[in-house]
């Protein structure tokens, strides 16, 4: 009686391991994107809350209005004027803030007249982040 595996048994094991690895790889990448979306949703909620906090602080000293900028004076870190350490994965251009997730991106616009921080809900990434 021979001890060991036949070539056919080894091929089956390799094929099964390949299938399992491909399924696991897809799940890992999807989980990573879900985590980044969750962090961005948290950032957006913090930013909106920070805008309201600045508005309330302005009211306490007799100035009625939303902050004119979401950054501290002279700072290049997005949102450090409304949340403590700013936010990662965001870039700023004027009053527009871009969040990138892989090859997709969405632009949020801050309107200091009414304190809104929002994006175009026709984009799927915007809906994933705000709804």
Q: Where on the chain are the PLM-derived regions?
A:
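Extracellular/periplasmic head regions of type IV pilus-like filament subunits
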Residues: 56-112
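N-terminal single-pass transmembrane signal-anchor helix
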Residues: 1-31
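Membrane-proximal N-terminal amphipathic helix
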Residues: 35-62
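Acidic/proline-rich low-complexity IDRs
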Residues: 7-9, 69, 100, 124, ...
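Low-complexity, S/T/G/P-rich flexible repeat/linker segments used as non-globular hinges
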Residues: 109-131
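Compositionally biased, intrinsically disordered low-complexity segments
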Residues: 22, 47-50, 86, 109
């Amino acid at each position: 009686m021979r001890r060991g595996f036949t070539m056919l048994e080894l091929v089956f094991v390799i094929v099964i391991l390949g299938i399992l690895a491909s399924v696991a790889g897809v799940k890992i990448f999807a989980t990573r994107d879900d985590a980044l979306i969750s962090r961005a949703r948290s950032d957006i909620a913090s930013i909106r809350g920070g805008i309201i906090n600045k508005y309330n602080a302005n009211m306490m000293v007799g100035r009625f209005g939303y902050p004119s900028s979401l950054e501290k004076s002279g700072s290049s870190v997005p949102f450090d004027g409304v949340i403590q350490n700013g936010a990662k994965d965001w870039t700023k251009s004027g009053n527009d803030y871009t969040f990138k997730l892989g090859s997709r991106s969405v632009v949020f616009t801050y309107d200091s007249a009414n304190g809104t921080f929002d994006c175009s809900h026709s984009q799927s990434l915007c809906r994933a982040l705000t709804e």
